[in-house]
């Protein structure tokens, strides 16, 4: 009888724990994805802060030339970064216990792999937590779908690209200048600016910014005033009110006259779907572009594609970009190889016709 009561008590305790985890009455929703997300993101954040402040230099290229990334080793906020795991490690799983010592683990850039893997799993759990909370509240699942765009982008630069290139040392450094270096080298090796998927991403980001500004300014300019001229129009709004807070007909009329009638949405649902879908689809395409360029399916190459009747090259902007790419290619990792890949396999292309 005692054993039976004990089992009931433990089951009741577990049941209360489950109810607390999945309760939507908590100030911050936890959820089952949150049970995984919280320790993963705390680990990634803690290791990032410690390594950014105090990690010793990392032999990123595997040639015994360590690169400093932390504040205590001479960097500032702009130049500092978590330096990617060494090329000597490649794609091997490199936890602390796989190294002979902590010094070796730090020298080979172990913190980068630790941060990236915990971070990627953590943001995937955050996306799952968004879906889980939407499900509990009876909402539709599109918040998590929208968040999948930045998750896909992060996964592309931190995981898919290193897999395609064969080493975590090719992943994006976790710092400002390191990110710029990653972008420049990526352009040199893959001609990303000439890749149509990157162009779609640019249209998504800049177009999304434009549409967000247009929508916010139109709504703010067509608020229904419930107050006098002597107090803020915002004071006339009550959270949860049934009445609409702005006049969509007025906003539609304004924008329809500013551009033309059919350039303006007259359906709020269609408008907000468009505002969400435009940047999300653009960033999806950019992530897909990074993931294909990871395996060296690169941007368009129009070098020396225009010639005169005598066969002489007439330079275009594509040739100017190619010249810049060659310059960036020969300057990066200049001690890691005798010749850049573009120049070592065949005769260098002419850049002046």
From Swiss-Prot:
SUPFAM superfamilies: Bacterial photosystem II reaction centre, L and M subunits. It catalyses: 2 a plastoquinone + 4 hnu + 2 H2O = 2 a plastoquinol + O2. The chain crosses the membrane at residues 29-46, 118-133, 142-156, 197-218, 274-288. PROSITE patterns: REACTION_CENTER. A quinone binds at residues 215, 264-265. Chlorophyll a ChlzD1 binds at residue 118. It is found in: Plastid, Chloroplast thylakoid membrane. Fe cation binds at residues 215, 272. The modification N-acetylthreonine is found at residue 2. It is a multi-pass membrane protein. Pheophytin a binds at residue 126. Its main location: plastid. GO terms for molecular function: chlorophyll binding; electron transporter, transferring electrons within the cyclic electron transport pathway of photosynthesis activity; iron ion binding; oxidoreductase activity, acting on diphenols and related substances as donors, oxygen as acceptor; oxygen evolving activity. The record marks 190 as: Stabilizes free radical intermediate. Residues 345-353 form a propeptide. The D1/D2 heterodimer binds P680, chlorophylls that are the primary electron donor of PSII, and subsequent electron acceptors. It shares a non-heme iron and each subunit binds pheophytin, quinone, additional chlorophylls, carotenoids and lipids. D1 provides most of the ligands for the Mn4-Ca-O5 cluster of the oxygen-evolving complex (OEC). There is also a Cl(-1) ion associated with D1 and D2, which is required for oxygen evolution. The PSII complex binds additional chlorophylls, carotenoids and specific lipids. The modification Phosphothreonine is found at residue 2. CDD domains: Photosystem-II_D1 (cd09289). Pfam families: Photo_RC. HAMAP family: PSII_PsbA_D1 (MF_01379). Belongs to the reaction center PufL/M/PsbA/D family. This is Photosystem II protein D1. The gene is psbA.
């Amino acid at each position: 009888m005692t054993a039976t009561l004990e089992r009931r008590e433990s089951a009741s305790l577990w049941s209360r724990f489950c109810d607390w985890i999945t309760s939507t009455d908590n100030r911050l929703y936890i959820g089952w994805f949150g049970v995984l997300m919280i320790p993963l993101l705390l680990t990634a954040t803690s290791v990032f802060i410690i390594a950014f402040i105090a990690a010793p230099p990392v032999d990123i290229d595997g040639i015994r030339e360590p690169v400093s990334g932390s504040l205590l080793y001479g960097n500032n906020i702009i130049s500092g970064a978590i330096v990617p795991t060494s090329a000597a490690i490649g794609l091997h799983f490199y936890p602390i216990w796989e190294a002979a010592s902590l010094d070796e683990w730090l020298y080979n850039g172990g913190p980068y792999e630790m941060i990236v893997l915990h971070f990627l799993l953590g943001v995937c759990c955050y996306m799952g937590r968004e879906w889980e909370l939407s499900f509990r509240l009876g909402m539709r699942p599109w918040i998590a779908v929208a968040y999948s765009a930045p998750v896909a982008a992060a996964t592309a630069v931190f995981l898919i690209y290193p897999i395609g290139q064969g080493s975590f040392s090719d992943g994006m450094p976790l710092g400002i200048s390191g990110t710029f270096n990653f972008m420049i080298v990526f352009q040199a090796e893959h001609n990303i600016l000439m890749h149509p998927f990157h162009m779609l991403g640019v249209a998504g980001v800049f177009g999304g910014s434009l549409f967000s500004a247009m929508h916010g300014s139109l709504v703010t300019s067509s608020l229904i005033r419930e107050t006098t001229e002597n107090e803020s129009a915002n004071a006339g709004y009550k959270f949860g009110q049934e009445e609409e807070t702005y006049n969509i007909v007025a906003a539609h009329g304004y924008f329809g006259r500013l551009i033309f009638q059919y350039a303006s949405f007259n359906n709020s649902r269609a408008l907000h779907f468009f505002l969400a879908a435009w940047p999300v689809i653009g960033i999806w395409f950019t992530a897909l572009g990074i993931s294909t360029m990871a395996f060296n399916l690169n941007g368009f190459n129009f070098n020396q594609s225009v010639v005169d009747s005598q066969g002489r090259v007439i330079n275009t902007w594509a040739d100017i970009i190619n010249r810049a790419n060659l310059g960036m290619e020969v300057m990066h990792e200049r001690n890691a190889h005798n010749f850049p890949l573009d120049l070592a396999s065949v005769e260098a292309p002419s850049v002046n016709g």
